[in-house]
Amino acid sequence: VKAIIPAAGLGTRFLPATKAQPKEMLPVVNKPIIQYVVEEAAAAGVTDVLIVTGRGKRAIEDHFDRSVELEQLLERSRATEQLHEVCAISDLADVFYVRQKRPRGLGHAVLCGASHVANEPFFVLLGDVIVPRNDCLPRLKDVHERYGGSVVAVSPVEPAMVSRYGVIAGEEVEPGVWRVTDLVEKPAVNEAPSTLAIFGRY
């Protein structure tokens, strides 16, 4: 099973914290955001991850690579728990990279991975969004297998918040599953077709 993780954005909403480091590498507790995303993919059976990066994102590649010097230092220091944690990062999945040479948006970032996934179904996980539950990707896969086509994860938001998200219009075909008829990006509160917001899992 394959996944594409777009991580090429400039992170301007998080300035100045992202001036010199990728937003995907901002820490949440003791791990960078993107590690949670790759862990979520791996927990859903993904073994092949393509991360779409851009200029200034080398830290992402270094994070998922082995660090022999660090591992040796931890081993000499008998920091067994930290050694295990550091080694586990590079064993989460086979991680590949492709660079989006110019910022052309999310759709283009996913398209950069087209030759990698070929004609197989694949997941897309935004590299700066943490999903608190691990059942999202299995549910997306289940809906895809039963209905075919592309599947997007949505979550209800407060009506006053719809202008911050892409929102779907559609008909509910079974509890929790909608056939999407339209996507509206950041609608005005009074023009939103629903309160079901897209949150970065496809």
Regions found by a protein language model. Give the residues of each.
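Structural signal for conserved beta-strand scaffold positions within catalytic alpha/beta enzyme cores
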Residues: P27, Y97-R99, V152, D182-E185
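Conserved beta-strand segments of alpha/beta enzyme cores
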Residues: E24, D94-F96, R179
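Catalytic-core segments of class I nucleotidyltransferases/pyrophosphorylases
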Residues: F123, K141, E145, E172-Y202
